[in-house]
A protein has these predicted regions:
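C-terminal secondary-structure termini that scaffold catalytic or DNA-interacting sites
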Residues: 79, 92-118, 122, 138, ...
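DNA/chromatin major-groove-contacting recognition/catalytic segments
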Residues: 36, 40-46, 93-100, 201, ...
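Proline-centered turn/helix-capping motifs that create local helix->coil transitions or kinks
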Residues: 6-16, 76-86, 90-93, 122-130, ...
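Catalytic-site neighborhood detector that most strongly recognizes the C-terminal catalytic loop/helix
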Residues: 24, 32, 88-90, 140, ...
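Basic, Lys/Arg- and aromatic-enriched nucleic-acid-binding interface segment
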Residues: 8, 12-15, 19-72, 77-78, ...
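Non-catalytic DNA-binding core/recognition domains of DNA-processing enzymes
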Residues: 1-5, 112
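Active-site/catalytic core of tyrosine-dependent DNA strand-transfer enzymes
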Residues: 36, 79, 87, 113-162
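C-terminal catalytic core of tyrosine-transesterase DNA break-rejoin enzymes
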Residues: 8, 51, 55, 59-66, ...
Length: 226
């Protein structure tokens, strides 16, 4: 029973939540790793022995908890896919635990390019008996999500690139995929979004560019036939 209904039915005198001030939602401006910076970024990642992990991130847009939770068995070499069925998250006590993604659409298979498969196979040869896709060289266990955020910051610093959040690598994947012709529904399914509408709302800037290009194409066509 809601507090408002309890007041209406005179079970309580007043709604104790009415005077509560909701905390402000912290909003972050979406940024992407600019295309001209991608090679510099990946070169810096390679020097740290982290190229497979961050290359995969840029071609898949996985959430950090999904990326760190990957097992070697999640890679389908033949079909060039990654199975996303778990994530590393903090529970209410602040402890890191493995759990299923929060929505069914987040449980998915993500297609990746052959270059990513080759990098992952080469990475696995370095630790063939370890079940984790990206084990920490220190502990042999999977990385904490916050650990790869810190690694990302170090890569940016090494490369002399401006700061962007690790989550912006996910935005980079989605934006570049849309700008290079991937349809919204496919991008949405790869990101694990609930529906294509949420993808459209998030990446309006990318789809608007494609609309502008389509308009110019139609304009050129009409100029030829008139």
């Amino acid at each position: 029973m809601t507090k408002k209904r309890a007041v209406k039915e005179r079970l309580i005198l007043r709604n104790p939540t009415e005077d509560c001030i909701a905390p402000k939602v912290q909003k972050f401006e979406m940024q992407i790793l600019q295309p001209e910076h991608i090679k510099t970024y990946l070169d810096a990642a390679e020097k740290r022995g982290l190229l497979p992990m961050f290359y995969l991130e840029l071609v898949s847009g996985l959430r950090k908890g999904e990326l760190t939770a990957l097992l070697w068995s999640d890679l389908d070499i033949t079909n060039r896919t990654i199975s996303v069925s778990k994530q590393y998250v903090k529970n209410p006590n602040g402890e890191l635990t493995l759990s299923r993604p929060k929505t069914e659409t987040s449980v998915r298979k993500v297609s990746i390019p052959q270059e990513a498969v080759d990098l992952l196979v080469a990475e696995h040869k370095k630790h063939p008996n370890n079940p984790y896709m990206f084990p920490s060289p220190v502990t042999g266990e999977m990385y904490y999500p916050d650990s790869i955020v810190n690694l990302h910051k170090k890569i940016l610093k090494d490369a002399g690139l401006p700061h962007i959040r690790f989550h912006d690598l996910r935005h980079t994947f989605a934006t570049l995929a849309l700008q290079n012709g991937m349809d919204v529904k496919t991008v949405s399914s790869m990101l694990g979004h609930y529906d294509a509408g949420s993808t459209l709302r998030t990446y309006t800037h990318a789809t608007r560019q494609k609309q502008d290009e389509a308009a110019q194409t139609m304009g050129s066509f009409m100029a030829q036939v008139m």
